[in-house]
Swiss-Prot record:
PROSITE patterns named in the record: GREAB_1, GREAB_2
Pfam families, per database record: GreA_GreB, GreA_GreB_N
Summary of the function given for this chain in its UniProt record: Necessary for efficient RNA polymerase transcription elongation past template-encoded arresting sites. The arresting sites in DNA have the property of trapping a certain fraction of elongating RNA polymerases that pass through, resulting in locked ternary complexes. Cleavage of the nascent transcript by cleavage factors such as GreA or GreB allows the resumption of elongation from the new 3'terminus. GreA releases sequences of 2 to 3 nucleotides.
Entry-linked InterPro entries: GreA/GreB_C_sf, TF_GreA/GreB_CS, Tscrpt_elong_fac_GreA, Tscrpt_elong_fac_GreA/B, Tscrpt_elong_fac_GreA/B_C, Tscrpt_elong_fac_GreA/B_fam, Tscrpt_elong_fac_GreA/B_N, Tscrpt_elong_fac_GreA/B_N_sf
Gene field: greA
Name of the protein this chain belongs to: Transcription elongation factor GreA
Amino acid sequence: MNTKFPITAKGFEKLEHELKHLKHVERKKISEDIAEAREHGDLSENAEYEAAREKQAFIEGRIKELEDMTARAEIIDIGKLSGDNIKFGATVTLIDDDTEEEVTYIIVGEYEADITRKRVSIASPIAKALIGKSVGDFVEVTTPKGSKSYEVVTVEYKELEL
């Protein structure tokens, strides 16, 4: 898959950090674990060896995945973005029309979404509904839990913390 995808500079740093850790720390550790397990004799009935080999396969798969992701990433520096319209990287404050509760979301890349930190994927229903809107606009969001209506209160572009 060669499709570029948007990611924040901080999100990209996180991917790179994980990739370096897997390559330079975990690879070495798993090689040592495999060598130690080999010393225990017959490999056909060696659970430690099998577990270490499975972990090695997982780590190598994740390394390949991260290498692919970092190669395809389109890094977007949110700190340099501005404007009144909502786009990737926006921190958006909304008011729920039903409850009058205020909620804030940050629109980020697919691989850095984390709802516990109010970071929603650009591919999510809420982000798709918000893209292109501005302060004062009303938006209807359809999710698996049903439909909700919000008013856009603020749109900001500011650097993310890791």
